[in-house]
Regions:
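An alpha-helical, amphipathic repeat domain used for nucleic-acid recognition
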Residues: 1-180
């Protein structure tokens, strides 16, 4: 246990986390180690982009400088790779039949830099991943709506395609082919 004089002599950083909750952390070398351990635990639980990891660590009460130092170190030793995370997330999104716009929104929501999200989405678009996802979505809605009026089938497909972020041109081609 420390005495009052020793406690008052330490530099203390406090940050507001919630509505009225304040987390107090001592600013010393142990803080960097604790932040690194917290970051590794978060990365063990699920892959994350550096932006999302940064938000989580700051919410836990670590200082901006400490968080930036830890993220830079994790990036340098290849434990944190935003590009690999973004590419993996694009595969996940296309597996859910999402389009380019929806995928970019999902990536930025998960803490990926907007420019990187656009670049990875452009690569996927050039490979035809989003086109394939739109066709798969069309096949799903063709099966689900079999027997319904053509106008109803098209409306439901267009609504789903719009929610998932597909371009109108792609949706038009798929609808003309599959939903007549």
């Amino acid at each position: 246990m420390i005495d009052a004089q020793e406690f008052l002599g330490r530099a203390v950083a406090a940050e507001t986390v919630g509505a009225a909750e304040t987390v107090v952390r001592e600013s010393d070398d142990d803080d960097v180690d604790a932040c690194r351990e917290a970051a590794l635990r978060l990365l063990d639980a699920a892959p994350r982009a550096s932006g999302a990891l940064r938000e989580r660590l700051i919410a836990k009460g670590y200082a901006d400088g400490v968080v930036d130092e830890v993220i830079e170190r994790l990036t340098r030793v290849h434990l944190l790779d935003d590009r690999a995370y973004a590419e993996s997330a694009v595969r996940y999104c296309t597996g859910r039949c999402m389009g380019r716009r929806g995928t970019v929104m999902e990536l930025t929501r998960k803490g990926v830099d907007r420019a990187l999200a656009e670049a990875v989405a452009t690569e996927a678009e050039q490979r035809g991943d989003f086109e394939d996802a739109a066709w798969e979505l069309g096949r799903q809605y063709a099966r689900k709506t079999r027997g319904l009026d053509v106008a109803v089938r098209r409306r439901r497909f267009w609504s789903a395609g719009g929610r998932k972020g597909h371009s109108p041109e792609t949706l038009r081609r798929v609808a003309e082919e599959l939903l007549n």
